Amino acid sequence: MKTQMNYAKEGIFTKEMQIVAQKENLSKDFLLENIACGKIIIPANINHKSLDPNGIGFGLRTKVNVNLGVSNDCVDYSEEMKKVELAHKFGIEAIMDLSNYGKTSRFRDELVNVSKAMIGTVPVYDAVGFLEKDLKQINAKDFLDVVYHHAKSGVDFMTIHAGINSRAAHIFKQSKRLTNIVSRGGSVLYAWMMMKDAENPFFEYYDDLLDICLKYDVTLSLGDALRPGSTHDASDGAQISELIELSLLTQRAWDVGIQVMIEGPGHMAINEIEANMQLEKRLCKGAPFYVLGPLVIDIGAGYDHISGAIGGAVAAASGADMLCYVTPAEHLRLPNLEDVREGIVATKIAAHAGDIAKLPKERARDDEMSKARQEIDWEKMFKLAIDGEKAKKMFNERRPDDLNSCSMCGKMCAMNTMNQILKGEDVSLA
């Protein structure tokens, strides 16, 4: 099976590439060159028939991922499908099913069937439920069996924590972290490695993993099991040692034509973000970077979507290619629909802020909004806003008598005052 990367290396412009080129207003040659060298990816499993393809990487708009899925405390697949609908409403490009309880295949199959967004999973979450074995009973090849079933079902990308091998684990043991390993998948694999006194199965059988990805054109999202879970732990030896391992694994995947993106932090002080983005790009030769946040403080419980948006904006401006959304429920509970909405909007704001910095053409929509404000064209403002529905609702809650203003300024509206005086008209504030 040929992948998008293999086609690009042969100069073949696939239908998925054509769609991405049109969406991003990019040339055929630019896309082919950057997909061939791994700087742009188009996650597109051959079995995901409802997919509306999007590209991630160099020269493209920053994409946003929404996480959803059930846990053993909250098993309501109907609510999770409502989250999918909400993600589609806001034009989200990627959705990850992080279900970690029970038999998840039915929900995943439905998700692949209905979602036009690319779908990602973390197969290790599904191992216990799928295999009906406790963690210690699972053998190395069992994990690959789970990966195969996810790939066959149509998943476009998978988080695989192959970088936490015995070398990285040794460095982690020597670290003096406040929050140890905060990656769910990473903690499960580390526990398995310690209990079995064995190498990480995804690292040991990496070539077998690549064969599965090659068969279905699954993109590898190389997970950062040792990402910092606190600002104290950011940029430490454990995090960087794993990133070096991921850079080596990236090249091995590229050698056979597998598309790759790298997952990143996490929690990180704002002054460390830019350097971390540059380090990933340097070590991993420009592979797309997919970051969670980063959250710039650790005390924002209930408001972590704001902390994540601040970090995400800096990350995107500094080269991050996809942001994983963070909701107000982060660290507290499974998010509800309102949490998901707030997380989506906050992260889209962060992504767009980053795009204005690195892709100046992306300011066009903002310029249109500024013109609409100057012209006091409310309907156009609502249409251009990231969340126009909320903007219109708030406006109407205290609707002014004079629509040439809002209830904040009334007759003292600066826009209206300047519009009148520049036309040579008198201004009356009485």
From Swiss-Prot:
<dbReference type="InterPro" id="IPR038521">
    <property type="entry name" value="ThiC/Bza_core_dom"/>
</dbReference>
<feature type="binding site">
    <location>
        <position position="406"/>
    </location>
    <ligand>
        <name>[4Fe-4S] cluster</name>
    </ligand>
</feature>
<dbReference type="GO" id="GO:0009229">
    <property type="term" value="P:thiamine diphosphate biosynthetic process"/>
</dbReference>
<dbReference type="GO" id="GO:0009228">
    <property type="term" value="P:thiamine biosynthetic process"/>
</dbReference>
<protein>
    <recommendedName>
        <fullName>Phosphomethylpyrimidine synthase</fullName>
        <ecNumber>4.1.99.17</ecNumber>
    </recommendedName>
</protein>
<keyword id="KW-0408">Iron</keyword>
<dbReference type="GO" id="GO:0005829">
    <property type="term" value="C:cytosol"/>
</dbReference>
<feature type="binding site">
    <location>
        <position position="125"/>
    </location>
    <ligand>
        <name>substrate</name>
    </ligand>
</feature>
<dbReference type="InterPro" id="IPR002817">
    <property type="entry name" value="ThiC/BzaA/B"/>
</dbReference>
<feature type="binding site">
    <location>
        <position position="161"/>
    </location>
    <ligand>
        <name>substrate</name>
    </ligand>
</feature>
<keyword id="KW-0949">S-adenosyl-L-methionine</keyword>
<keyword id="KW-0862">Zinc</keyword>
<keyword id="KW-0004">4Fe-4S</keyword>
<feature type="binding site">
    <location>
        <position position="263"/>
    </location>
    <ligand>
        <name>substrate</name>
    </ligand>
</feature>
<dbReference type="GO" id="GO:0008270">
    <property type="term" value="F:zinc ion binding"/>
</dbReference>
<keyword id="KW-0411">Iron-sulfur</keyword>
<comment type="pathway">
    <text>Cofactor biosynthesis; thiamine diphosphate biosynthesis.</text>
</comment>
<feature type="binding site">
    <location>
        <begin position="224"/>
        <end position="227"/>
    </location>
    <ligand>
        <name>substrate</name>
    </ligand>
</feature>
<keyword id="KW-0479">Metal-binding</keyword>
<feature type="binding site">
    <location>
        <position position="290"/>
    </location>
    <ligand>
        <name>substrate</name>
    </ligand>
</feature>
<comment type="similarity">
    <text>Belongs to the ThiC family.</text>
</comment>
<dbReference type="Pfam" id="PF01964">
    <property type="entry name" value="ThiC_Rad_SAM"/>
</dbReference>
<keyword id="KW-0456">Lyase</keyword>
<keyword id="KW-0784">Thiamine biosynthesis</keyword>
<feature type="binding site">
    <location>
        <position position="331"/>
    </location>
    <ligand>
        <name>Zn(2+)</name>
    </ligand>
</feature>
<feature type="binding site">
    <location>
        <position position="96"/>
    </location>
    <ligand>
        <name>substrate</name>
    </ligand>
</feature>
<feature type="binding site">
    <location>
        <position position="67"/>
    </location>
    <ligand>
        <name>substrate</name>
    </ligand>
</feature>
<feature type="binding site">
    <location>
        <begin position="183"/>
        <end position="185"/>
    </location>
    <ligand>
        <name>substrate</name>
    </ligand>
</feature>
<feature type="binding site">
    <location>
        <position position="409"/>
    </location>
    <ligand>
        <name>[4Fe-4S] cluster</name>
    </ligand>
</feature>
<comment type="subunit">
    <text>Homodimer.</text>
</comment>
<feature type="binding site">
    <location>
        <position position="413"/>
    </location>
    <ligand>
        <name>[4Fe-4S] cluster</name>
    </ligand>
</feature>
<dbReference type="GO" id="GO:0016830">
    <property type="term" value="F:carbon-carbon lyase activity"/>
</dbReference>
<comment type="function">
    <text>Catalyzes the synthesis of the hydroxymethylpyrimidine phosphate (HMP-P) moiety of thiamine from aminoimidazole ribotide (AIR) in a radical S-adenosyl-L-methionine (SAM)-dependent reaction.</text>
</comment>
<feature type="binding site">
    <location>
        <position position="267"/>
    </location>
    <ligand>
        <name>Zn(2+)</name>
    </ligand>
</feature>
<dbReference type="GO" id="GO:0051539">
    <property type="term" value="F:4 iron, 4 sulfur cluster binding"/>
</dbReference>
<dbReference type="InterPro" id="IPR037509">
    <property type="entry name" value="ThiC"/>
</dbReference>
